Regions:
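FIC/Doc superfamily catalytic core
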Residues: 1-184
Length: 184
């Protein structure tokens, strides 16, 4: 059963990479980009609709009929599409702290956060933060905790879905960035 799941995961990655390379619209890569980006950003409070998210992915433009849009929502949406592509391109590579920081830089580059003196883009947080009233790992402990997490994860030859989920839960608990942890 485990071997069958591993083969399915390899097949899925092959399909994602092939559709990404070919620019095929309407396939699993197209749907994954839109759904993952919309839902990840929506959880974080993005004001963009599913339709606006899809339109940004498909046309790199956005139309607004009524009201206004938060520019950071648009920038982070466009950046998230590039982030997902980079993850797909590097899915078979060893996961490193440098790569994770690169993903954060890609996500937050050009946002108002990137212009704040206290906000670190592309590196771990310098100030303590909390999520839903729960304290996260103190800044001075983040690098060590990330090293432990990555050493544990990278030691596994074949990663199962449970391994990925376990990694994600631990990653979120560390909460190494000032913002953007879940989307990274």
């Amino acid at each position: 059963m485990e071997e069958m799941l591993q083969n399915r995961n390899k097949l899925l990655l092959d399909i994602l990479q092939e559709e990404k390379s070919s620019g095929y619209a309407g396939g699993i890569y197209h749907k994954t980009q839109i759904e993952l980006t919309y839902n990840s950003n929506h959880i974080e409070g993005s004001s963009l609709t599913h339709e606006q998210t899809r339109y940004i992915f498909e046309t790199n433009t956005i139309g607004v009929e009524d009201g206004s849009l938060n520019v950071d929502d648009v920038i982070e949406t466009a950046n998230h599409f590039r982030l997902v592509s980079l993850i797909i391109d590097n899915a078979k590579s060893t996961l490193t702290q440098e790569f994770i920081k690169k993903l954060h830089l890609l996500l937050k580059n050009g946002t108002s956060d990137s212009r704040r003196d206290w906000f670190v883009v592309g590196d771990y947080k310098k100030l303590p933060n909390e999520v839903g009233g729960m304290h996260t790992t103190p800044p001075e402990e983040v690098s060590g905790k990330m090293k432990e997490l990555l050493d544990e994860y990278n030691a596994k030859e074949e990663k199962s879905l449970d391994d990925v989920l376990d990694f994600h839960v631990k990653f979120e608990k560390i909460h190494q960035f000032q913002d953007g942890n879940g989307r990274v």
